[in-house]
Amino acid sequence: MKKLLLATIIFLLAFPCSAEPEIIAHNSAATKKIAITFDDGPHPTHTEEILDILKQYNVKATFFILGVNAAQYPSIVKRTFDEGHELGNHTYNHVFVNRVSDEALREEIRKTDDIITEITGRAPIVFRPPGGAYNDGKVAVIASTGHKCILWSWWQDTRDWSCPPVDKVVSTVMDNLHDGDIVLFHDFNSGKTPTAAALRIIIPRLIEKGYEFVSVSELIAAG
């Protein structure tokens, strides 16, 4: 019995179990910190309006960028970076990562990294899968490309892409508020988006409550 136990210990030391790839959606240790995030941009008008609001309140955010849109609007990507916001990878063509091959996913990530790096001089280190769709295998692929896989706090999905009333977006954020939340917005919307109007209400209220706005990477490192 002792020999079996010793052999088991030796085996585990020689072949340690690898940790599951991490998916980040919240950091409860980030006291009085919040990360607001925007998916699918840049958009030629919506992103600029959002950037103006963030600049007005000296708020930093994280933008998960589609490569195809970055290629079309590089000046907006550059402005976003220059104003101190974090840029994340959101694939090139908004593909659902659980529906493509590992090779195709790596190519989507690589192409988007390349164009963001070309524009800003810095490659993204965070990645958000479109639609929040993933599986363990694809999270491992994402990790192998050097990116952290970021979702959002499930209670902080504003669903602004569906163009709800402004007060609905505001209540989603304010009524479900926790330290260390990652809030999901979209800066690319073909409809009558409520996002900018909601931000003009949400940001001052969060400031009044003493919240600090940080990038996703800063939120992860907090606490």
List the model feature ranges, each with a label:
Residues 4-13:
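Sec-dependent N-terminal signal peptides
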Residues 21-28, 57, 69-71, 193-223:
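C-terminal domain-boundary segment and adjacent tail
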Residues 35, 89-91, 151-155, 182-187:
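Short beta-strands and strand-loop turn motifs
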Residues 15-19:
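Sec/Tat signal peptide C-region and signal peptidase I cleavage site
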Residues 125, 133, 139-176, 210-222:
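His/Asp/Glu-enriched short active-site or ligand-binding loop at hydrolase and phosphoryl-transfer sites
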Residues 20-100, 104, 108-115, 221:
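Active-site beta->alpha N-cap acidic-glycine motif
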Residues 51-60, 64, 86, 102-136, ...:
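CE4/NodB-like, metal-dependent polysaccharide N-deacetylase domain
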Residues 95-100, 158-160, 185:
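A short acidic, helix-capping loop that chelates divalent metal ions and anchors anionic groups
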